[in-house]
Amino acid sequence: MELSAAAGRRRQAPWREFTGRHRTERSQERGSTPRKERSMGSRQPRKREREPRDCTPTCTNAASVSRSGARRAPGCAGRCITMKNCARAWRELSERACCFQAVPPSNMKQSWLIFLDTTLCSAWLLASSCPRLYAPLISFHCMCFNTVLLFPRLFGPTLSAKIQFNTDLSLRAIAWKCTKDTTTYC
């Protein structure tokens, strides 16, 4: 028993030595830095200037289609909305409403949106009766056209809507699908 305990101590020793040395080196480096350099910044209050909104779309790539025919959304469209960051998501959505003024690429006219959360479903249905409200729903996901925009399942059935961009930049839904489990109701 004594032999195995000694072997165990010997095995742990190099790690303890390394971590101990690493800690002392870091603390010495920190101590050598003059206090003024370490200050967090000036204490003067910042002037609050209204920054112009950035309304440029961050991505315009189309979703790639695999050989089996299944659509795959690009990375930029896979923003994860959970209950935790739902409020932030809606804030971003409303802030990006101005992005609708950006002209979509001429070769990309349609987009499938998939909503798995009933809150988003109701927002979409509300938007369908008011064309101006389409804008934030589209621009929220980086203005990605011809893509399947996926929201993770929170609860309820899946509502899909195919959106078409008209030449005058207005939008309209040209197809609807509602899926529950494996059944699709068109």
Swiss-Prot record:
Domain of life: Eukaryota
Induction and repression of expression: Up-regulated upon activation of cAMP signaling.
Start-end of Basic and acidic residues biased regions: 18-40
Gene: LINC00473
GO biological process: DNA-templated transcription
Job description of the protein: May play a role in cAMP-mediated gene transcription.
Protein name per UniProt: Putative transcriptional regulator encoded by LINC00473
Disordered: region residues: 1-62
